[in-house]
Swiss-Prot record:
Subunit field text: Component of the RNA degradosome, a multiprotein complex involved in RNA processing and mRNA degradation.
Localization per record: Cytoplasm; Secreted; Cell surface
Organism: Actinobacillus succinogenes (strain ATCC 55618 / DSM 22257 / CCUG 43843 / 130Z)
CDD domains: enolase (cd03313)
Record's keyword annotation contains Membrane: no
Annotated Pfam families: Enolase_C, Enolase_N
Coiled coil residues, start to end: none
Catalytic center residues: E209 (proton donor), K343 (proton acceptor)
Protein name as it appears in the record: Enolase
Swiss-Prot/TrEMBL catalytic activity: (2R)-2-phosphoglycerate = phosphoenolpyruvate + H2O
GO biological process: glycolytic process
Length: 433
């Protein structure tokens, strides 16, 4: 038995300079797990609650001392003495103790930090790397793959202070044979994009996720700049590198008018018009994945978009599904989207995260493992992507150590696993096999 002997919570700082929760779980035998909760900027309305103190005299109200107190008191008292290797039981104890539908008593940030720290401690006690332990928890021991990265190299929307409405323009280095090579291709395109933007007189400051955040004239111009950068780097768009976008449409959807208002371009669209706008972009550029291409509540719009684009484009639900099996189940039954974005802190525990990945895969949906815009040096999502053989990961650009930490962990894992973890490339993307 991997007996829990101590649980410690503390307030640390994330990549945006805001507080977040870090937890340590200590086991008999001296094994320790350490994990931190990430934090989102554009959040789905049905996400589990991230508990903030609201005390304006500390961190502008964003302190997390209440969540930390829950870790150090109620949660610690409930799990000390329990077996850390029973992850589902530990997570359920915390969920039941919280007692709310959205983890609002203790905060998903408190429960998640302990959940992940517990898994890390249990893995250490078994002498396993975290990815191997996650594969065991997932019921797929020894089954691994290296994920295709979606690298967010131009940031807009809520992730940047600019006039670009679409939140993320991403590259996927599909021509790579290994994860390490994919990272190299991404880096080369990133540096060439800096040169392209500079030559056009644009700012090369970066956004929350390490991508550039210039004031471009249109969303199409962002794609044109990326195309030029790919070619300057010596690669062919569509063959070596494909494109993906996160529209984060809920951020520019006007619920009163029912229109998608792209202020950066001075244009507005009905739900169906916006789908056809995206369809035109897909004809002009090799865009193989679109995330949140409609407002999270516009299920009719999503159904139409799935009908129009779903055979050839991966349609990823983020704000739409919020890593929640109840919502995902309904989406699967209604034929909404064909992929889910997986974010630990949207649901708030490792067990529930694994359940969402399994449900998606069983239904023929893909699962894209994702960071949040507020991150730390914690690289657990790298192990999650490999240990569940998810096939795809979204963890930012080629700058900011909070992003690069995940790529570096993937490089280490690939080195350790060798040919036991194949890099699937474009085959991992829905509609591209």
């Amino acid at each position: 038995m991997a007996k829990i002997v101590k649980v410690i919570g503390r307030e640390i700082i994330d990549s945006r300079g805001n507080p977040t929760v870090e937890a340590e779980v200590h086991l008999e035998g001296g094994f320790v797990g350490l994990a931190a909760a990430p934090s989102g900027a554009s959040t789905g309305s049905r996400e589990a609650l991230e508990l903030r103190d609201g005390d304006k005299s500390r961190f502008l109200g964003k302190g997390v001392l209440k969540a930390v107190s829950a870790v150090n008191n109620e949660i610690a008292q409930a799990v000390v003495g329990k077996d850390a290797s029973n992850q589902a039981e530990i997570d359920q104890i915390m969920i039941d103790l919280d007692g709310t539908d959205n983890k609002s008593k203790f905060g998903a940030n408190a429960i998640l930090a302990v959940s992940l720290a517990n898994a890390k401690a249990a893995a250490a006690s078994k002498g396993l790397p975290l990815y191997a332990y996650i594969a065991e928890l997932n019921g797929t021991p020894g089954q691994y793959s290296m994920p295709l990265p979606m690298m967010n190299i131009i940031n807009g929307g809520e992730h940047a202070d600019n006039n670009v409405d679409i939140q993320e323009f991403m590259i996927q280095p599909v021509g790579a044979k290994t994860l390490r090579e994919a990272v190299r291709i991404g880096s080369e395109v990133f540096h060439n994009l800096a040169k392209v933007l500079k030559a056009k007189g644009y700012n090369t400051a970066v956004g929350d996720e390490g991508g550039f955040a210039p004031n471009l004239g249109s969303n199409a111009e962002a794609l044109a700049c990326i195309k030029e950068a790919v070619e300057k780097a010596g690669y062919t768009l569509g063959k070596d590198v494909t494109l993906a976008m996160d529209c984060a449409s809920s951020e520019f959807y006007n619920k009163e008018t029912g229109k998608y208002e792209m202020k950066g371009e001075g244009r507005s669209f009905t739900s169906q018009e916006f789908t056809h706008y995206l369809e035109e972009l897909c004809k002009q550029y090799p865009i193989v994945s679109i995330e949140d291409g409609q407002d999270e509540s516009d299920w009719d719009g999503f159904a139409y978009q799935t009908k129009v684009l779903g055979d050839n484009v991966q349609l990823v639900g983020d704000d739409l599904f919020v890593t929640n099996t109840k919502i995902l189940k309904e989406g699967i039954e209604k034929g909404i989207a064909n992929s889910i974005l997986i974010k630990f802190n949207q649901i708030g525990s490792l067990t529930e995260t694994l359940a969402a990945i399994k449900m998606a895969k069983d239904a023929g949906y893909t699962a894209v493992i994702s960071h949040r815009s507020g991150e730390t040096e914690d690289a657990t999502i790298a192990d999650l992507a490999v240990g569940t053989a998810a096939g795809q990961i979204k963890t930012g650009s080629m700058s900011r150590s909070d992003r690069v930490a995940k790529y570096n962990q993937l490089i280490r894992i690939e080195e350790a696993l060798g040919d036991k973890a194949p890099f699937l490339g474009l085959k991992a993307v829905k509609g591209q096999a």
